[in-house]
Amino acid sequence: DQTSIIKYIERKYYEDLLDELPVLNDYVEKLSKKYKKEEVEYDKVAELFYNIYREMTVHIETEQSDVYPLLLTYYEENSDAAYEALKPHITRLLDEHKNIVHWFKQIRSLTNGYTPVDSNEPLNVFVMKKLEENEDNIMT
């Protein structure tokens, strides 16, 4: 049923993302500071990832507090009024998703496909790997 699907999405994606995004944001900032002089694009990567972190956090909170209750009402009532109440929220969430996709594309470009500038440096390798994993997880 619909409630089970929503609970599955929250467990499978949202809980992990809400745990991981702030930690990864800290690591991205550390990487940016470490390579500030040699790799100036890492400053932009840090800025873009902070945008993703902020947008995803708000996105998830909005879905849980506003969209899911409206969605369940729509499934229960299947009425035009429930659909109209839900529609602007869905439009906004789709716009947020487009922003996130755009920011990840920029990060991918700035990092040459998430290629570490120093493959012998664990922080660099870790951050690039986690950025790519997050892009994959968010895009699916």
Region annotations inferred by a language model:
Residues 1-139:
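Small-residue-biased structural context
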